[in-house]
Structure formats: structure tokens, C-alpha cells
Amino acid sequence: DSGDPPLFEVGSMPIVEGIRKAGIVVDKERPVTFLTVKEPVTIVGPNGGFLTYYPAAAGDRKLTLDVAIDFPTAIGKQRVVFDVWDDAFVHGAHARTNCSQAVMFYMKTIGKLFADTRNLGYTKDNILVAGKRAYVNTPKLLHDGKSLEAVWHRACLDLIAALSLLDKGR
């Protein structure tokens, strides 16, 4: 819950495309620490949201995530379960960050007075704005008529940010 500023109208796809273009280089000189999930591990947030890591089947090297959020806005309860792999992150990278209608109002008015918020670039194109009962703008990543944009943002983009903060980025 860092209050991350919005990036692009297309979520984080420009970052994904930049990484793909630059390529990934394996540094064989640096030691790598591997973590093994031996049993389900769940982290629960104060509002009922959670992230669960599941162990892979014997001989399998995949990581399965079960992510849920529960916001007191039109976003409401959302949940996705997926195996972490390239296509899942590309799908999730289309998700924009989100905020409530009240936060958007603040950013567009009083927030312009303060140096830490005046240039964050909040628009209805690059952020999902949720009112109490309905979205202010058009949500993306629909499944069965319901937007899962906020939970995909949490599952993919917030997870990448958290993992990047691990010791030595590994």
C-alpha cells in the first residue's frame, strides 16, 4: 500500500517491452539463493486481502499464486489464481494502478499544492478510478463481466516491486 503513482495508459507494458528488448543476462559470477515453498504460505492484509504461495508438485519448478483483494469501493472482492510465468505477467502488466474517487479528487485539487503529489500525473486514462458503487472510468481485464484489473495489478506489479526489494535483488 505504497500509494504508487500511475505510469502509463497501458499499465506496465512499456516496462515489459523494455525488458524483452534489452534481454536478460544471467550473472554466473554472483551466487544465487533459491527459496523453496514446502507448504502453502499465506500473507493476509488488514482488509481481508491475501497472497498465498503454493508449493510445486514433486519435480516441478513452477510457482502458483492465489491473490485476493477486498476494497470498500466498486473494486470490491477480486481473486486470481495463476502459475507465475511470462505470459501471466504480460497479461497482468496491462493492469493500471487504482485509486478511489476521493483520492483522484484530492490529487486533482488540493494535491496540486504539495510537492510530493503535484506531479504524479493522475488521469482517468492511466489509473482505474473506483467510486463507492461504480467505476468512474472504463475498467480493463474483464472476466465474466467483472474487472479483475486491481487484483492483477496487486498480483503481478506489486509482487515484482516487493521481490525487487529482497536482499541483493535475488
Kindly give the residue locations of the regions a language model identified:
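Short acidic-hydrophobic catalytic motif
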Residues: D1-R170
